[in-house]
């Protein structure tokens, strides 16, 4: 499972309140949530997110448990999130909504804003097409990969009995 897009780079400890502020949790439409993704940190994020790979530092998605954070990023058009580490609940929520995630050590030191990236979730690597550098990460395996390939948990469960 591969995706390709331009990098949008942020730092460490981006919490779910930054990814989607609480005042927008009344909405369920992914497109509406996407219009407000990352609003406190980067009001221009929705304009640059479509077809992008979000790159972040440590503890991405920490804070309160809200699946709307992953839905908002997907609704904004983010193709994948690559981070040095993830809060476990965000990581699982992303997989459950069909948003590819990959953990890659030191990725924020090796990727710049606007770099063209290819992310291979199953292979567990990121290829920086701008620099030619390949960064090894932690590949998804087993059930999490199957859920992601199905497009999320709901789709996975719909097809599991077949």
Swiss-Prot record:
One of the Pfam families matching this protein, by short name: Aconitase_C
Pathway(s) it belongs to: Amino-acid biosynthesis; L-leucine biosynthesis; L-leucine from 3-methyl-2-oxobutanoate: step 2/4
Taxonomy, superkingdom: Archaea
Gene Ontology BP annotations: L-leucine biosynthetic process
Transmembrane segments: none
Catalytic activity from the UniProt record: (2R,3S)-3-isopropylmalate = (2S)-2-isopropylmalate
Entry keyword set: Amino-acid biosynthesis, Branched-chain amino acid biosynthesis, Leucine biosynthesis, Lyase
EC number: 4.2.1.33
A GO molecular-function descriptor: 3-isopropylmalate dehydratase activity
Amino-acid biosynthesis among keywords: yes
Subunit composition and interactions: Heterodimer of LeuC and LeuD.
Role according to the record: Catalyzes the isomerization between 2-isopropylmalate and 3-isopropylmalate, via the formation of 2-isopropylmaleate.
Family recorded in the similarity comment: Belongs to the LeuD family. LeuD type 2 subfamily.
Protein name: 3-isopropylmalate dehydratase small subunit
Organism: Pyrobaculum neutrophilum (strain DSM 2338 / JCM 9278 / NBRC 100436 / V24Sta)
